[in-house]
C-alpha cells in the first residue's frame, strides 16, 4: 500500500531498524530476508533523501533525520495496531499478552507481587516483564516500549493519563543493635550518622527524601549509594549507619531482618504512588483490564501501620 508515493511497509522496516540497530536482527523481527531489508533501507533513503543509518561495526547508527522520524513512525504504527488490527474482544483467560512495566523494587515487593499472584489465577498465560527505573520513562511510554509506569506521581509527565494507587510515607531504619536509635532521633544525630541511600536509573537520580532535603538546603553524610531501596537493610546490618525508605517496605524487611524503624527527625512528606499508561492505550481492552486489576489491588492495600516501638528517652 502506498501513501503519497511511500510504501507503508517501509515504515515497519524503519521502526524495526530503529529498535534493533542491526540489519540482521531487524530483518528477523519482521520476517524479511537480509537482502530484502537492505533493499528497504535503499528505498527509505531515496524517499526521505537522507542516509538514515551509518555503519559502526555491525551496529546501525541513526542519523538525526532517522531519529526525528522514529517517534512519529512508532506512534503511527501503534495507532494502527490498536485501532484497526487489535479490535477483537479481550479474553484474559485466553490471552498470552505480555505487559512491560517500569517500577521500583519497593513497588515490586509490596504491591506487584499481589498482581502476579492474582493474574496467575485469573489469566495464567499473561506474562510480565518488570523493568527498573529509566532516566526517560515518559519517552518509553510515548514510543510504546512499555505498557505501564508505576512511580511516585510527582515523577510522572502530564502527557499521558494516570491513576492514583496509594499514599506512602518514609521512615528511618537502622540495625536493631544500633544504640543511637534507642532514643528519639535528633536532626543533629541524623546529620552526623553515615547514611545509606537509594538512587535510581543510570544517572543515579536522587530519591524522594533527598529531593526534600535538597529543597531545604540540607545535606547528609552519605557513605553508601545503592540501586534500590531493598538493598538498604543488608548494608545496615551490624553497623551504626542509617537509611530512609518507604514504611511498607521497612515493615516487610522487619519481619526477617534485625531492623529498627524510627521516625525521621523532621517530617518527610507523604508521597503518592500512581500508575501511568500511554495515551493511545486508553481504549485498548487489555490495558483497561490490567488497569482495573491494578486499582482493585491498590484499594485492598489499606494503610501502612505507622505505630513505631517506644524508645527510651534521655
UniProtKB/Swiss-Prot annotation:
Alphabetical list of SUPFAM superfamilies matching this protein: Periplasmic binding protein-like II, Winged helix' DNA-binding domain
UniProt KW keywords: Activator, DNA-binding, Nodulation, Repressor, Transcription, Transcription regulation
Keyword Protein biosynthesis (UniProt): no
Keyword Transcription regulation attributed: yes
Single GO molecular function: DNA binding
DNA-binding region(s) in UniProt: 23-42
Pfam family, one: HTH_1
Remaining remarks: There are at least two nodD genes in B.elkanii.
Protein name per the record: Nodulation protein D 1
Organism: Bradyrhizobium elkanii
Amino acid at each position: 500500500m502506498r501513501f503519497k508515493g511511500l510504501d507503508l511497509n517501509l515504515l515497519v522496516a524503519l521502526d524495526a531498524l530503529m529498535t534493533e540497530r542491526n540489519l540482521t536482527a531487524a530483518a528477523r523481527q519482521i520476517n524479511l530476508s537480509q537482502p530484502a531489508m537492505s533493499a528497504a533501507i535503499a528505498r527509505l533513503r531515496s524517499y526521505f533523501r537522507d542516509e538514515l543509518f551509518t555503519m559502526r561495526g555491525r551496529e546501525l547508527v541513526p542519523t538525526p533525520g532517522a531519529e526525528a522520524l522514529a517517534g512519529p513512525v512508532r506512534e503511527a504504527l501503534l495507532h494502527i495496531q490498536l485501532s484497526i488490527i487489535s479490535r477483537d474482544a479481550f479474553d484474559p483467560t485466553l490471552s498470552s499478552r505480555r505487559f512491560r512495566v517500569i517500577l521500583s523494587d519497593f513497588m515490586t515487593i509490596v504491591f506487584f507481587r499481589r498482581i502476579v499472584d492474582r493474574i496467575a489465577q485469573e489469566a495464567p498465560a499473561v506474562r510480565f516483564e518488570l523493568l527498573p527505573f529509566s532516566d526517560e520513562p515518559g519517552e518509553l511510554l510515548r514510543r510504546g516500549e512499555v505498557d505501564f509506569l508505576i512511580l511516585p506521581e510527582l515523577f510522572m509527565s502530564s502527557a499521558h493519563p494516570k491513576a492514583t494507587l496509594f499514599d506512602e510515607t518514609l521512615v528511618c531504619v537502622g540495625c536493631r543493635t544500633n544504640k543511637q536509635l534507642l532514643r528519639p532521633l535528633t536532626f543533629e544525630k541524623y546529620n552526623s550518622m553515615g547514611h545509606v541511600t537509594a538512587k535510581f536509573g543510570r544517572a543515579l537520580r536522587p530519591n524522594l527524601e533527598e529531593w526534600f532535603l535538597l529543597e531545604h538546603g540540607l545535606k547528609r553524610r552519605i557513605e553508601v549509594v545503592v540501586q534500590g531501596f531493598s538493598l538498604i537493610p543488608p548494608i545496615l546490618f551490624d553497623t551504626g549507619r542509617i537509611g530512609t525508605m518507604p514504611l511498607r517496605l521497612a515493615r516487610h524487611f522487619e519481619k526477617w531482618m534485625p531492623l529498627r524503624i524510627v521516625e525521621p527527625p523532621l517530617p518527610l512528606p507523604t508521597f503518592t504512588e500512581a500508575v501511568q499508561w500511554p495515551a493511545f492505550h486508553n481504549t485498548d481492552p487489555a490495558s483497561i483490564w490490567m488497569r482495573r486489576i491494578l486499582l482493585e489491588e491498590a484499594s485492598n492495600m489499606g494503610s501502612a501501620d505507622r505505630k513505631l516501638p517506644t524508645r527510651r528517652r534521655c
